[in-house]
Curated annotation (Swiss-Prot):
Residues 4-52 form the F-box domain. Coiled coil: none annotated. This is F-box protein At2g26160. PANTHER family: F-BOX PROTEIN (PTHR47123:SF25), F-BOX PROTEIN SKIP23 (PTHR47123). Pfam families: Beta-prop_KIB1-4. It comes from the Eukaryota. It comes from Arabidopsis thaliana. Transmembrane segments: none annotated. InterPro entries: KIB1-4_b-propeller, SCF_F-box_domain.
Amino acid sequence: MEKPEWSELPGDLINLTANRFSSISDVLRVRSICKPWRSAAATPKSFQCNLPSSNKMIETVLSPTTFFRVTGPSSCSYKGWLIRTKQVSESSKINLLSPFFRQLLTPSQQTLDLLKFEVSEIRQSYEIHIFDKYLIQGVIGKEGPSHILSRVVFLDNLIFAVGQDDKIWCCKSGEESSRIWTKIKNQVEDFLDIILHKGQVYALDLTGAIWWISLSPLSLLQFTPSIPMDYDGYDSCNKRLVEYCGDLCIIHQLRLKKAYIRRSQRTVGFKVYKMDEYVAKWVEVRSLGDKALIVARDSCFTVVASEYHGCLNNSIYFVDNVRKSVIRMKL
């Protein structure tokens, strides 16, 4: 039996193949092979953006973005670039964002041919934009969200977020869902961050303890003890969760006040801790090795530094609140 041409493969088989890819970039690659494949392979499904709310004057919108590693067509180059994209709707183009600021970059007439570049998905990140129509109507010219929740994770059809009250909230996504946002019970502490780690959801409280979120029943269970905090000489310590070398770790971003700028603080250092499960004790990570840590507003993750242009190992990249620029610090 003669082998059929790629363009003549059954449409059902092409669509079945495309549906096995979880990455949007992989599905787009399948669709870009030829016109018959583009017609047969379904457009990647996007998340249900509008989330249910009991208050008709308040609209909550899920805003997902995706981090990618892109390498050029040259086979001799193994280094790539870190990019961030956002697609507003299924029919819209994919927009390029600043990886750290989530801002839309200057539009370009050029397009990225996925057949000429290696594009690999790193991770997805989420924010929840809250539009309070009472507040928006009261401010002339205001069009953006009233509030932004930047500590958000997505697991199956469940969305978890650290709310404005520093508590963990949960909501079902999907058109068939009519549930409103629900606050998880038995919360004894306020929370700073939330993360999806090995298929489980964990949250970080103010004391530096990590809590595991049980889905059935929906509740919080303490997973680790608090981190001893002895930071004399610093004005504040911002804490974040990150996965490093398979371990769940806590980042401490140490800050000092700027005397000449009101309500402004500068970052003067970082500390990273991981739990030693054998002795049930927090230990400090002295070096990131060949890794670099990316600290964005809504996402923290590590990359292999040698795989990216201009990226140095054992480094932490973050945004300086005063200069509004990306800063690098050695751990």
